[in-house]
């Protein structure tokens, strides 16, 4: 309350704040005059504080059922399972209900298309259509954005001003944030996801946007909800390609015991590594990254410390990723060749969304998911072996001319295959 009073004296007349379930239950937000309240989503969290999910939801709903005054507004998604409760609260307390969704909503989503590192969104509001490029990844980001638009409009901002400003939006620090693209075009994201639902949303979002199962580095915090640990393992097993279990603020718990509880959630132990030291786990994930792959480092996001009992160590996932010297990492010969080749071929392939795991000029030993480059030498012309390369499961062939009786969709033409 003191901070809000200070802000008001500075002439600021609109404030957006997070109403935590702890603060609501402890009546720390009582007395504040909320004009708009947003309900984004509800999932398992804070069960070290609340008795169960029912009590947790009850605490969150205090904002809507007690603190909002008559004729003020609730903003939410009309597709979430908590919507009927919010609708009933709005009716009983005579509140205005503003919604986002694909039908029967204040803002109606018409279409959404994934692009490289952004989304093309079309929506309708007050009988007017808007089409915008949103520089964020994930449908959850779109939902949050649309709810923010309604809240901003309710704060007195003009809708056209709001829409024009969207192109300037940047990811929230540590929230599904692209930190680095490696020479092999693998992308590294960090995210604060530390609950089963948040982790599932992030992994699923990356999988849907880039059409590939991400690799994931994650752990679970000590002295927090223990029930979620094996559940998070199950989520990773469902959506991730490679899984690296590491430490994430063990606090006064045994890090080894936390890792064991995580491991208990896996049905299979395939493609899973336990690497306690977080920086080493991140480095290992980068070393093992595939060309055009995705790595998600989850759990800490924006945080800059790692807590082991009474020790608080400086540790930032973002800093670790940025400071890794790719040239000094000891890649396997296979991976290093892929990095060099994909760095050269990136400009050629980026427009076609081509996925591959290696490059070869030998049609006889080419492997599945490789690209074959048809090079003309003194004695042989690689174009004569394109058919053989495709028969041996090459994904695509790079050529400088069309080949008879070969599907053109399997050919990537360039002027000179050697260059």
What are these regions (language model features)?
Residues 95-96, 147-160, 164-356, 361-396, ...:
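ATP-dependent carboxylate-amine ligase
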Residues 22-23, 303:
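Active-site beta-alpha loop architecture of Rossmann-like, nucleotide-cofactor-dependent enzymes
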Residues 8-19, 25-29, 34-188, 263-273, ...:
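Acidic, Mg2+-coordinating active-site environments of NTP-dependent enzymes
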